[in-house]
UniProtKB/Swiss-Prot annotation:
GO terms for cellular component: cytosol. SUPFAM superfamilies: YggX-like (SSF111148). This is Probable Fe(2+)-trafficking protein. Could be a mediator in iron transactions between iron acquisition and iron-requiring processes, such as synthesis and/or repair of Fe-S clusters in biosynthetic enzymes. Gene3D superfamilies: Fe(II) trafficking protein YggX. Keywords: Iron.
Length: 91
């Protein structure tokens, strides 16, 4: 059975995560405030960031950068900027 939360990213009620996807206090906040739909949007942006900026998850600096981008995207309403990328609707 899915749980319903108020998603702070979507600003509406939506299906919550089935389990905590990220460690620590930030992970608890994501579990309680971010829906499956919003998390899927972040995963798409995260993949683009990793690929375009050639980030390595073995690097603590790169992981920290991704975490900062994640917080800005999910909780501060800032879109991820990827140089050279134009969304399809803006082309």
């Amino acid at each position: 059975m899915s749980r319903t939360i108020f998603c702070t990213f979507l600003q509406r009620e939506a299906d919550g995560q089935d389990f905590q996807l990220y460690p620590g206090e930030l992970g608890k906040r994501i579990y309680n405030e971010i829906s499956k739909e919003a998390w899927a949007q972040w995963q798409h942006k995260q993949t683009m960031l990793i690929n375009e900026k050639k980030l390595s998850m073995m690097s603590p600096e790169h992981r920290k950068l991704l975490e900062q981008e994640m917080v800005q995207f999910l909780f501060e309403g800032k879109d991820v900027h990827i140089e050279g990328y134009t969304p399809p609707e803006k082309q």
